[in-house]
């Protein structure tokens, strides 16, 4: 299949060099090139691709079960649209480590998400029931505890809640993803007294080399958040 980078860089497979007239490999990659097929210098296309890649890693590392991804996805390795590179012992299938410098932003983001996963045992189901009576997993499609599957919602929120391993406080994480091409507003669940929502991760935030991805912005007394187009926001209750 496609690498994660290629998933957002190619609409079609490009297996011509395999020698089968591009007839091999899966034809249903469900990919999107974000407006340009393959490599491009368009900053808008490249910016969107990076945001979607971050969204994918955020979803993976906020999911239950073992988190696995293809080697090189953490620095946007490419197979140039080839989704069946079994016969390519060359740059098509090799890991191009030079991309680590070009895509340091993605590499740093993946490191941040791995650390975030380690810090929140609820994402790994290493918790007891929460003391605040929130369910362990709940769905919030646009509004609190709205589990509707109506396609018009366009905005999904998933909240994890449990008692941490030391049994000292609740571990509450809210994952929110807007796949729509316009900004949308998410209504957040009201937290128990003394706790407030903090933004931990925003895949639309501007990146500065060496920045602290863990810096949080507190939402004092606010139970709504504007989610930019095609963006993931992760909040924690503190």
Which residues does each PLM region occupy?
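Alpha-amylase-like alpha-glycosidases and glucanotransferases acting on alpha-linked glucans and related
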Residues: 1-46, 141
